[in-house]
Design a protein with these regions (language model features):
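Loop/helix-junction capping segments adjacent to catalytic residues or to phosphate/diphosphate-binding pockets
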Residues: 43-45, 287, 334
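Short, flexible loop segments at the rims of nucleotide/cofactor-binding pockets, characterized by
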Residues: 11-12, 204-205, 347
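Short amphipathic alpha-helical coiled-coil/interface segments
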Residues: 341, 354-369
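Signature of N6-adenine DNA methyltransferases within the class I
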Residues: 1-167, 247-249, 261-263, 270-278, ...
Length: 370
């Protein structure tokens, strides 16, 4: 892979990327290549170069969209099937779906130009919806206000004590001196709600210091938003409990609340993903209210903005969350929206209906994006 044989390798590329490029390289003139591959080929950064190669240097005949269709029993990632011919690009390509009765049928046609969602990320849009990753380009994004991180990976560090313990060995349903911190996973949360709490072994010889991915302790000792990484975005707030969580949950911590905490994770994130320096982001984060951000991320427009970022993918990746555009209205507007979020939180505690509040909130948030 160190040679220049593969032009498609980009960032943390997946193994199927060079296999696709190799298949294309081996084609004779007018030969055709197809492969069942992960759906993230259509929308992830690591696939950008390959998407560009396929649409500009070859003829993309068809893409079978298998998003949501279980092809491989034990796989968690959805799939797609590109059909690529070694000839000049044509004016149209077919988008096909898998239907009951195990038939694949055409649902729409697109030009290579309309397939492309935007120039920046070269995401393929396999739907009829108009999507663009450049909407509200003049707004701040969530990453300007918050440090975004996955949680811990709770098995033993592969380089230190591989196989010495697994996640289940560290979790208890009841509190004791060893399992001393409240712990949640993505399946334990919903919009504005934590549904279940368990307890994690903490400050022992093996946890967190011998974890595969321990993150850093201070991440869990401050106020934050917590959200899932699959499907519809569900966000709640952690202002008092300071839950520990695993990698199925992302957290968003205001930059100002990490002031004076310096480590490789933070510095690397700033270098790779941020357009402002740390001092500027700490200042910016002082201008937003965490309850306001909670309301924004749980609003109906957030679903639309997330679709702009991830295309049709079922997964939510940190870069999707980090790049969500966020309006910055006056403090009084933020307070009013945040107060509705607080009221919804109270209703969720007693499982009361909050649809009227959500409707009101959606209207208020939508007005900020007009």
């Amino acid at each position: 892979m160190a040679s220049n044989k593969y032009k498609s390798l980009n960032e943390k590329w997946d193994l199927y990327i060079p296999f696709i490029e190799l298949g294309l390289q081996l084609l004779c003139t007018n030969g055709t290549f197809s492969m069942i591959v992960p759906y993230p080929l259509t929308n992830q950064k690591y696939g950008k170069k390959l998407r560009k190669i396929i649409t500009e240097e070859y003829c993309l005949l068809e893409i079978t969209d298998l998003n949501g269709t279980k092809v491989f029993e034990n796989a968690t990632v959805s799939n797609c099937i590109p059909f690529v011919q070694n000839c000049l690009p044509k004016e149209e390509l077919r988008i096909t779906h898998f239907f009951e009765g195990k038939t694949i049928q055409e649902v729409l046609r697109k030009s290579p130009e309309t397939l492309k969602q935007d120039e920046k990320d070269y995401i393929w849009n396999l739907t009829r919806e108009e999507r663009t990753g450049t909407r509200f380009a003049n707004m701040n994004v969530l990453g300007d206000f918050c440090y975004i991180s996955k949680g811990m990976v709770l098995n033993a560090n592969e380089n230190v004590e591989k196989g010495a313990f697994k996640k289940e060995d560290l979790i208890s349903d009841v509190y004791d001196k060893i399992h001393s911190r409240k712990y949640i996973e993505a399946k334990d949360i919903d919009k504005y709600q934590v549904k279940r709490v368990r307890y994690l072994e903490w400050n022992t010889e093996r946890c967190p210091d011998k974890l595969s991915r321990p993150t850093f302790r201070e991440l869990y000792d401050c106020s934050k938003l917590i959200l899932n990484c699959l499907g519809t975005i569900n966000v709640t707030i952690d202002k008092e409990e300071y839950f520990l969580h695993n990698h199925s949950i992302y957290c968003a911590v205001l930059w100002k609340d990490l002031k004076d905490i310096n480590n490789k994770s933070i510095s690397s994130s700033i270098k790779k993903f941020c357009r402002y320096n740390r001092i500027e982001m700490e200042t910016l984060s002082g201008k937003v209210d965490l309850y306001y951000l909670l309301a924004i991320l749980n609003s109906s427009i957030a679903d639309e903005l997330l679709a702009d970022q991830r295309g049709g993918d079922y997964h939510i990746y940190p870069e999707h969350i980090r790049n969500l555009p966020i309006p910055l209205p006056e403090k009084e507007v933020q307070k009013n929206i945040g107060n509705i979020a607080k009221e919804i939180l109270q209703r969720r505690k007693v499982n009361a209906d909050y649809s009227d509040l959500q409707e009101e909130l959606d209207k208020m948030v939508a007005s900020l994006y007009q």
